Amino acid sequence: MLRISVRLAFLTALVVAPPAFAAMANDPQITRGKYLVTLGGCNDCHTPGYFFGNPDMSRFLGGSDVGFEIPGKGVFVGRNITPDKETGIGSWTPEQIVKAIQTGERPDGRILAPIMPWHAYAELAADDAMAIAAFLQSLNPVSNQLPRPVKPGEKISTFMFRLVPPGETSAVAAK
């Protein structure tokens, strides 16, 4: 009876906590990925509350609560990059995550928002890019439905920062 209980407990742990189990399976890669995500400042745009000085670490990388306006392009919100299958990148493979980080292309062929600095990550070593993907997949999924990107001139429903290219400050200030 005790043997059956131990087996059931073990099987339940495997089913209930797959991200934690995955993290244990390749800890050095996950650790490296966490380091690179921290160094790359991913939380800046992808963690709620970060820009207000009060990051909500229970929703770490679960998507921002701030939009970024790029004049002439619209307003974009940092997406949920946790493994939530509905609102995050939980259905993406590690290779698809790496492609998005390094080329700015999503699995469905759409291009990431212009604010995503994929150009800065285009030359990451393959091992480093895969470490980032492994770390992101090891996180607890965060369900967080975010506003869609907003076209120029459309009404927005979130706080936003306006990014102003050099030389355009006086035109934007006049608005």
Annotate each PLM feature:
Residues 83-89, 118-120:
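Second-shell loop/turn segments in exported
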Residues 33, 39-49, 97, 132, ...:
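The canonical Cys-X-X-Cys-His
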Residues 89-92, 124:
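Alpha-helical hairpin
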Residues 94-98, 102, 126, 130-133:
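An amphipathic alpha-helix signature
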Residues 27-28, 47-76, 107-175:
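Flexible coil segments in periplasmic/lumen-exposed cytochrome c-class electron-transfer proteins
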Residues 21-38, 51-54:
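Electrostatic cytochrome c docking/interface patches
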Residues 5-19:
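Bacterial N-terminal signal peptides
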